[in-house]
C-alpha cells in the first residue's frame, strides 16, 4: 500500500538477534515489541517483556484472530485505533511530509479496505489524521469517510501543532458535515 518510491522508508517489523521483534521507524531508535504491551491472554507471571514476536500475538493479529478473541472474551465488537505510542506519534518523526502522509494513507486504506470489511459490525475502524496542516487533515478526513471507517483519531490539532488555531475550524466543520466522530 505504501508507494514504491517510499517503501524503503516505511515503518516495519524486524527480527532481533534474540529472536524477538522490533519496530524500525525512520528517525527513531529500535523499539522492541514490548512497546505493544503484549500481556493479553497471559497471567502476570508469564509475561516476558523481551524476545516477543508480533505475529500471532493476542489482540493484534488478523481480523479472523481478532473475531475469535472477541468471541473468547464475550465481546460483540470493538473500536479499532492505533496506540499513539506505537503508531502515529512515532510516524510523525518521519521528516519528509509526503513519506509521512503516505504511511497514514496506507494505514487507513488497509484498515478500511482489508481489515474491517472482514466483519464491519464487529471491527469498527477509526482512521488516522495526519499531523501536518488543515488541508491535509480535511483531505484525509474525506478519504476516511469514503472508506467507510466510523471515525477518526486525532493526535494533534488539525493544523498539525500542539495548540489550536482558527484555521482548525474548517476541519471541525467538515467532521460535523460528514457526521464523523473525532
Per-region residue spans from a language model:
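Helix-coil boundary/capping segments in enzymes
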Residues: 1-182
Amino acid at each position: 500500500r505504501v508507494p514504491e518510491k517510499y517503501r524503503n522508508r516505511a515503518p516495519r517489523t524486524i527480527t532481533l538477534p534474540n529472536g524477538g521483534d522490533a519496530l524500525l521507524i525512520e528517525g527513531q531508535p529500535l523499539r522492541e515489541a514490548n512497546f505493544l504491551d503484549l500481556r493479553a491472554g497471559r497471567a502476570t507471571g508469564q509475561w516476558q517483556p523481551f524476545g516477543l514476536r508480533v505475529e500471532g500475538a493476542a489482540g493484534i493479529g488478523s481480523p479472523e484472530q481478532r473475531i475469535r478473541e472477541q468471541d473468547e472474551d464475550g465481546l460483540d465488537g470493538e473500536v479499532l485505533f492505533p496506540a499513539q505510542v506505537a503508531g502515529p506519534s512515532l510516524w510523525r518523526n518521519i521528516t519528509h511530509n509526503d513519506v509521512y502522509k503516505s504511511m497514514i494513507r496506507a494505514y487507513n486504506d488497509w484498515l478500511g479496505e482489508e481489515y474491517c470489511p472482514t466483519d464491519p459490525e464487529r471491527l469498527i475502524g477509526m482512521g488516522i489524521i495526519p499531523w501536518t496542516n488543515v488541508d491535509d487533515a480535511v483531505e484525509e478526513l474525506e478519504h476516511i469517510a469514503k472508506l467507510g471507517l466510523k471515525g477518526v483519531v486525532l493526535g494533534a490539532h488539525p493544523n498539525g501543532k500542539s495548540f489550536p488555531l482558527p484555521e482548525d475550524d474548517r476541519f471541525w466543520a467538515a467532521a460535523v458535515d460528514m457526521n464523523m466522530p473525532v
